Amino acid sequence: MPKRVQVVLNEDILSLGKDGDLVDVAPGYARNFLLPFGKAVPVTPAVMKQVEHRRAKEVERQAALKQEALNFKTALDTIGRFTVKKQVGEDNVLFGTVTNGDVAEAIEESTKKEIDRRDILVPEIHRTGKYTVTVKLHSEVTAEINLEVVSY
């Protein structure tokens, strides 16, 4: 009996690897858990071809996502400034603070494209004025946008 067997994962497994990874596991782990539950398949030349094909498709998909992010960054740079209106008290101090949700709404109003608020890094904003906000569009693409906070 071999000490380790090679399998290709069909899904992400936290302690083992990601979908499509070639991993060495104990034969009992493969035989009793991974293979019966469809979480992995034994390594064969046909399976390896499928894995390579899947990886090539994933590389193409990531390249397309990166290009889309670069195009969106250009659109954000073209617009230039985004405005958020907040209620203001004395000395231009805001009631509350400007959140990444507020910035996401301002971007969506201007670009008509949805953006996840969790990808927006907003500094502490408690007064009206002009600020710089970082937007993560892709793992390799970030944009710096100008945000103006005004009273209404």
Curated annotation (Swiss-Prot):
Stored InterPro entries: Ribosomal_bL9, Ribosomal_bL9/RNase_H1_N, Ribosomal_bL9_bac/chp, Ribosomal_bL9_C, Ribosomal_bL9_C_sf, Ribosomal_bL9_N, Ribosomal_bL9_N_sf
Biological processes per GO annotation: translation
Superkingdom of source: Bacteria
Disulfide bond positions: none
Signal peptide span: none
Gene Ontology cellular component list: ribonucleoprotein complex; ribosome
One MF annotation (Gene Ontology) recorded for this entry: structural constituent of ribosome
Keyword entries, A-Z: Ribonucleoprotein, Ribosomal protein, RNA-binding, rRNA-binding
Function: Binds to the 23S rRNA.
UniProt similarity note: Belongs to the bacterial ribosomal protein bL9 family.
PANTHER family: 50S RIBOSOMAL PROTEIN L9
Protein name listed in UniProt: Large ribosomal subunit protein bL9
Gene this chain is encoded by: rplI
